[in-house]
Swiss-Prot record:
Localization per record: Cell membrane
Regions that span the bilayer: 3-23, 38-58, 80-100, 113-133, 137-157, 170-192, 213-233
GO molecular function: intramolecular lyase activity; lycopene beta cyclase activity
Family: Belongs to the lycopene beta-cyclase family.
NCBIfam families recorded: CarR_dom_SF
Reaction(s) the record says it catalyses: a carotenoid psi-end group = a carotenoid beta-end derivative; all-trans-lycopene = gamma-carotene; gamma-carotene = all-trans-beta-carotene
E.C. no: 5.5.1.19
Main subcellular location: membrane
Full protein name: Lycopene beta-cyclase
InterPro entries with a match to the protein in the record: Lycopene_cyclase_dom
Disruption phenotype: Strains lacking this gene show undetectable levels of bacteriorhodopsin, retinal, and beta-carotene and accumulation of lycopene to high levels.
């Protein structure tokens, strides 16, 4: 019997989310502005992901197993909205548990901003090319969708992110590996099914590369956002 989407979230995402919440509460330093960073990113994640997710579901890039969801809001199951929320919280709390140590004195140049934005544009161009072929449509949709956010974040502080690359790597890789493993189970169990028409068929340890790319990109969004947010706060103070 296929696991329900809600049960999957409760079992796979719930325990680490609660554990990170307990750690965050134990380390609470009263800095409301810093804590607000996760809330800001949560609102942005929902508003940016919802139309994209709905479009891909409507296109038939993936669908859900029979009886695995409790209801839908537009094309997306209610649980999908919960997944966006819980992933953002999970990664956000993880990032804030790391030693960010923002460097207030670091200042980017206009040239840095231009280079960062151009890099994001190049990513978008690559995604647009992949969108033209059915087999790479899903991976192209992920890359093209990621490009505007990456362009903005890199324009703001790609050089600062490079200086904090070790923390950034830990911030991204740990939740990406965890969520990819959980996603691998969900696909194997039939909670959601990817369309062969829109995917490459390439897998790593049974996980479609498109799904790994999605979790990598979204965790990059959250990690870069919070690292840059902490840096901007330090500069303002």
């Amino acid at each position: 019997m296929t696991t329900s989407y809600l049960t999957f979230l409760a079992v796979a995402v719930g325990p680490p989310l609660v554990a990170l919440g307990v750690v965050r509460a134990a380390r609470w330093d009263g800095d409301r502005a810093r804590a607000a960073g996760v809330g800001i990113l949560l609102a942005l994640a929902l508003s940016y992901t919802t139309p994209w997710d709905n479009y891909l579901i409507a296109t038939g890039v993936w669908w859900y197993g029979e009886g695995t969801v409790v209801g839908r809001l537009w094309q997306m199951p209610i649980e999908e909205y919960l997944f966006v929320i819980t992933q953002t919280l999970l990664t956000g709390l993880w990032v804030q548990a790391l030693p960010l140590r923002p460097t207030a004195g670091f200042s980017p140049t206009r040239r840095d901003a231009v280079l960062g934005a151009l890099a994001g544009v190049l990513v978008g161009c690559g995604g647009a090319v992949l969108l033209t072929v059915d087999a790479t449509f899903y991976i192209g949709a992920i890359i093209a969708w990621a490009a505007p956010v990456l362009a903005l974040q890199w324009a703001v502080g790609w050089r600062y992110l490079w200086r904090r690359r070790r923390v950034f790597a830990a911030a991204v890789l740990v939740p990406t590996l965890f969520l990819s493993a959980a996603d691998r189970y969900a696909i194997a169990d039939g909670i959601w099914i990817l369309a062969g028409q829109y995917t490459t068929g390439i897998t790593v340890l049974g996980l479609p590369i498109e799904e790994g790319a999605f979790f990598f990109v979204t965790n990059v969004f959250v990690s870069q956002g919070l690292i840059l947010y902490a840096w901007v706060l330090a500069r303002w103070r």
